[in-house]
Amino acid sequence: MIDFFLKSEYLPAGDQPKAIKEIENSILLGNKYQTLKGVTGSGKTFTIANIIKDLNRPALVVSHNKTLAAQLYREFKDFFPNNAVEYFVSYYDYYQPESYVPSKDLFIEKEATINTEIEIKRIRTVTSLAKRRDVIVVATVSSIYALGSPDFFKKSAREFFVGQKISIKEISDIFVELYYERTLMNLERDKFSIKGDIVEIWPSSEHGEFAYRICLDFDEIVEIYRVSSFSKKKLGATNSFTLFAKSYFVIPYENVLEAIPKISHDLSLQCQYFKDNGRLVEAERLKQRVEYDLEMLRETGFCSGIENYSKYLSGSTMERPYCLFDFFPKDYLLFVDESHVTLPQFRGMYNGDHSRKLNLVNFGFRLPAALENRPLKYDEFEALINQVVFVSATPGVEENEKSSVVVDQIIRPTGLVDPEIITRRSDGQMEDLYSEIQKRVALKERVLITTLTKKMSEDLTEYLVNLGVRAKYLHSELDTLERVEVISLLRKSEIDVIVGINLLREGLDIPEVSLVAILDADKVGFLRSTTSLIQTIGRAARNSNGLVIMYYDKISLAMREAIEETNRRRQIQIDYNEKNNITPKTIVKKIQNILEKELNNKNKNVGYDFEKIISDERLSKKKLIDKLKFDLEEAVNDERFEDAIVLRDKIKELSSKISIARNKKREV
């Protein structure tokens, strides 16, 4: 078994060694629940990485949104370069679920746009879990949604090796059995090609980097190469490779045949139920829809909406559907990041899904079995937990009550202390805020301002810009790339102030920010709860000059609790620094994007070079632009937005050069 190897220039420091030891001891004692209560900037991710390395177990790290999941994914990829670090989030760019609105007698067909790159990562996740133990998966709430049987997926594995006695036809039959399609055109993902004694296949779990080329001689594999999926350049020889089904929804055809009579039986029962209750329209509707699906299953082994028949097709006797948790070995570790937000998400998924599908069943659009294609109920999720570490700066009641140990991680390795908090009356707040911004700008530091509404953030930004402040607003109506560009501008000192709403809470890591201003800090509500205020205060905790100003009319209970907790932590940190003669230092975080190194590696692997690309006549320019677009899509899906911006600009530059070259040829 391959061990987890943690790569880092640093050793655990501050409260990290204590936290690592206490949590590991609790886990080794067999306790199911533990909580890491770590302040912002205390290195909670590094603590998790050390626990995974020391206990040497597969791990699932769950976050509450794609952006933070991608952040964690990148960090764990850096920490564990020699191990399998995977990313499992929803693969829908757009999703309109099948639904029925009785009040309008309106049936809405399912519509979805699937993000190919995220789908690849999901397949790669289950493939890694089927092949090895040294796996870390970073996921979102998608981890509790229905998947296919892990046993069926593992049994789909087929190995190909040099010296294997096998014919081209046998290889082709295996590929088809694993849901791959043959192509006579250019090789694409999920397809294979046959040319003479050479077979090439592009596995579904590969990110477009390479395909496999199998060379045969008289029904024997003599060579296997990895080749670039785009340039077909050889990347290296290998003695063998294992291929899994192209989808994690693996359904053996015998299961389809066994399911058909069961579906027919339940159809008869449900139609009779409708007729007995005088609902002939629903009975006829259900009969027509299900009989059409049955005909498709008989003919092709597949039908539209096949997931609604997963109860029959999976062969499972469980009352719940399979999900990502079932692909893990029994001794895996679960880490719930920002648990105060993530756990309520897990708790709420089932009810919304169930009420929508119940309408479909009650009005004859689906059989009752469709209700079993669903996210897990909360108690089902809890039953699948082996051992868990809740991770949050502000853990909720559930985490505190269930955990055998709640470990504080207050001391930061950098010596940074929680920011000082000043409260000021809201009278004259605009003039006061402008004055504070000027002080920070003079020191070449940055400012975050949080408001309650989008309109307020836009109006305040306009007000500041009119005063000559370099400011931009940040809220959910900006698309992902636009939001990242705004943050990038702040970090690069091209603007000094960001005005936002809820986007300034968990996970926004900008060490240049020394002032966080909270307007309407006393207003009662989600955005000004104790937890939200503490999280917002944490945005100023990565700078040695960190300061938070709360503007208020009347100090609220949430304000008082947030201030008391922050001051408690701050005093502990100051005392520790004085005792150990530590001078706090602002975190230095590189502004440049991580694309440069990755592109250098990709240039070596896939055969293109930005500097030589125009003059290289051996390669198709269109194919090279397609490759860059592929990388751009991958960067966006990985939430590597600064990388995506560089790639986007490079595509524009390259397209422009090609256009100029074409025009010159026309002139000649």
UniProtKB/Swiss-Prot annotation:
Role this protein plays: The UvrABC repair system catalyzes the recognition and processing of DNA lesions. A damage recognition complex composed of 2 UvrA and 2 UvrB subunits scans DNA for abnormalities. Upon binding of the UvrA(2)B(2) complex to a putative damaged site, the DNA wraps around one UvrB monomer. DNA wrap is dependent on ATP binding by UvrB and probably causes local melting of the DNA helix, facilitating insertion of UvrB beta-hairpin between the DNA strands. Then UvrB probes one DNA strand for the presence of a lesion.
In the record, biological process GO terms are: nucleotide-excision repair; SOS response
The UniProt record lists the UVR domain at 622-657
Q: What is known of its domains?
A: The beta-hairpin motif is involved in DNA binding.
On subunit structure and binding partners, the annotation says: Forms a heterotetramer with UvrA during the search for lesions. Interacts with UvrC in an incision complex.
Offer a single GO CC term for the protein.
cytoplasm
GO molecular function, one example?
A: DNA binding
Q: Entry's NCBIfam families? A: PRK05298.1, uvrb
Helicase ATP-binding domain segment(s):
25-170
Q: Where does ATP bind?
A: G38, V39, T40, G41, S42, G43, K44, T45
Q: Which family does it belong to?
A: Belongs to the UvrB family.
Query: Per the database record, which ranges form the Helicase C-terminal domain?
Result: 429-595
What name does this protein carry? UvrABC system protein B
| Encoding gene (name) | uvrB
Annotated source species: Borreliella burgdorferi (strain ZS7) (Borrelia burgdorferi)
Tell me the compartments it is located in: Cytoplasm
Q: Which SUPFAM superfamilies match?
A: P-loop containing nucleoside triphosphate hydrolases
Indicate yes or no for the key word Cytoplasm: yes
The primary location reported for this protein is cytoplasm
The organism's taxonomic lineage, starting at the top: Bacteria, Pseudomonadati, Spirochaetota, Spirochaetia, Spirochaetales
Spell out the CDD domains in the cross-references: DEXHc_UvrB, SF2_C_UvrB
Where does the motif Beta-hairpin lie?
Answer: 91-114
Keywords, alphabetical:
ATP-binding, Cytoplasm, DNA damage, DNA excision, DNA repair, Excision nuclease, Helicase, Hydrolase, Nucleotide-binding, SOS response
